[in-house]
Amino acid sequence: QAKILVAEAEENNLGEKVINERWARWYACSLCEQRYHGVVGFALGWACWKTHVGRPETDQVRGLAMRLLGSGLSETDHLEDAFSVQEAELSILRRIGASEHHILGVQTNLASTYYKLGHLEKALSMERDVYSGYLKLHGKEHEDSLRAALNYTSSLVALKRFEEARALLRKTIPVARQVLGDNYEDTLKLRWSFAVALYVDPAATLDDLRESVETLAEIEVI
């Protein structure tokens, strides 16, 4: 059904908004609007890719299909395959001169796959580049920049670089609370990451542990 709807929208020049709405049928239920996950998401991603693989590399729909395939592979723990798809997608985007925003999105997915594969240093390096890229593109108050900071600090904590993680989070959390609000999911995740970066540090002081507990208590209330 998604294949037919997208093709119809393109053929009749119904516009980007309509195409995007119909494209969503590939990855989300039209009734409840929840995203497909696991083997269902993977199966639809694979079907989507087979449907659109014959299009030129510069075709937007082909690029979306490739991203959907990579996400499906990653979610079902076919990590090496996901890595190959995402790396190929990034190479294509750079070759065809895609927008910086599009490239940063693919780099975010690739960094996540690096992390899942246990390549933490590579994940950190790419997340640092993504965070820097979003800051230049949108500024520190944009949601993409805040989410990139969250990913970056998660890798810093995983690599036991607690002081660096806390320093970035101390700068980022006030911005997130002001822009997104205290109840927003990304704000809560940033604060949780800060609490973790405090209490898992072997060098944590009593004041650090107290601040961590207080932060977690505040999050729980919210």
Residue positions per predicted region:
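Intrinsic-disorder-linked linear interaction elements in eukaryotic regulatory proteins
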Residues: 1-222
